[in-house]
Amino acid sequence: MIGSVLYLVNSQMDTLSIITWLLVILPFPILGTLFLIYTKQDWGYRELKSLIKKSTQAIKPYFQYDQRILYKLKESHARTYNLAQYLHRSGGFPVYKNTKVTYFPNGQSKFEEMKKQLLKAEKFIFLEYFIIAEGLMWGEILSILEQKVQEGVEVRVMYDGMLELSTLSFDYAKRLEKIGIKAKVFSPITPFVSTYYNYRDHRKILVIDNKVAFNGGINLADEYINQIERFGYWKDTAVMLEGEGVASFTLMFLQMWSTTNKDYEFAPYLTQNFHEIVANGYVIPYSDSPLDHEKVGENVYIDILNQARDYVYIMTPYLILDSEMEHALQFAAERGVDVKIIMPGIPDKKVPFALAKRYFPALLDAGVKIYEFTPGFVHAKVFIADDIKAVVGTINLDYRSLYHHFECATYMYQTDCLVDIKADFKETLKQSRRVTRSTLQKEKISTKLIGLVVKLVAPLL
């Protein structure tokens, strides 16, 4: 037990994670220590970690880093320049101009545009999604993919291994292969070896011909387009990139794909064959990996909060915070920044929702304004600040996204779509009820007790 305590105290874990593990180990020293070893040694993921490391190094030289663009950004906004420098150093991610960004305020609008763009594909289609479920949405997309295969377009589909326990059969990848689609399962679940929840591919990426890319919270299942109802109205968001910035998503996909077959052929898919797009602002697509000690997703969010002067508006389905993120939210509000958070009115998971409410009192006391979307569930992951910067992607405000999953997002500075993002937030706000100390007191006792108990193990959720 002493060895376990020494390991925890000297680890790079955040304070709450260390406390959580101590609460597990102290009353149950043998079982707790074995569980710690099981989760931290990653026996089922050592090969994956090695492959990810190799593919990450292999792909870095292909990121086209234009120093001139960076200098222009420095001249217009030094603080955003500093963040761009960080993203380049942490993952090699370049900053782009000449990239048009279109914002979608719901799954329905994204779905319609996806189909239009898929039908235009001439060379390749790459899809990487956390959830794919058979139904109207996936059925229509699959029909287009089959058509494109017949036309000679290379189609690749990759989905997370957890789907084999939920929405897709174990042989689904083989079924796709039979119709000419190259298919991969990322990190299949291995009983008693996989930790199940860790190292999941939570990313959502669609790339077409290195010309167009989609990113955001919307998976390929019918609830995301409100074709079926789950937890009321499903509020989600996405962005479409056209132009130079698409290359980063092409490379992100190829990097993850290569972990399953060590195929490091990247250059043929990076041909710049699109008409030059003139667009305002700067775009930085980026990803985050749980296999290093760099919390890229969280660091970007915290930077937005720390640099904000007027407002930060946030949409997130979950709110399970480490001390750094909680402090950043509080400090921004205490500095006079208008911090607003919209969360679900109807949660998809009751325990995490009860846990989120344990963070509400301290945030409210600091001046953070919290709202719940009354028509249903908010699955969007959006930050927008001061009319000049925003992030749309897959990164939730919880430990799973910030520490344990593979994620991706699009950082935007002074792009034209910021107007649409802010307008959508305000429209969503009109459909939301404000949370106050008074409303929290009216919560069910069971909800309060669940949140109180579960907060002790928040980092494990």
Curated annotation (Swiss-Prot):
Its main location: membrane. One of its GO terms (biological process) is cardiolipin biosynthetic process. One of its GO terms (molecular function) is cardiolipin synthase activity. Keywords: Cell membrane, Membrane, Repeat, Transferase, Transmembrane, Transmembrane helix. This is Uncharacterized protein SMU_988. Residues 197-224, 374-401 form the PLD phosphodiesterase domain. The keyword Transmembrane helix applies. It is a multi-pass membrane protein. InterPro entries: Cardiolipin_synthase, PLD-like_dom, PLipase_D/transphosphatidylase. PROSITE patterns: PLD (PS50035). PANTHER family: CARDIOLIPIN SYNTHASE, PHOSPHOLIPASE D. The chain crosses the membrane at residues 18-38, 124-144. One of its GO terms (cellular component) is plasma membrane. Pfam families: PLDc, PLDc_2. SMART domains: PLDc (SM00155). Belongs to the phospholipase D family. Cardiolipin synthase subfamily. The keyword Cytoplasm does not apply.
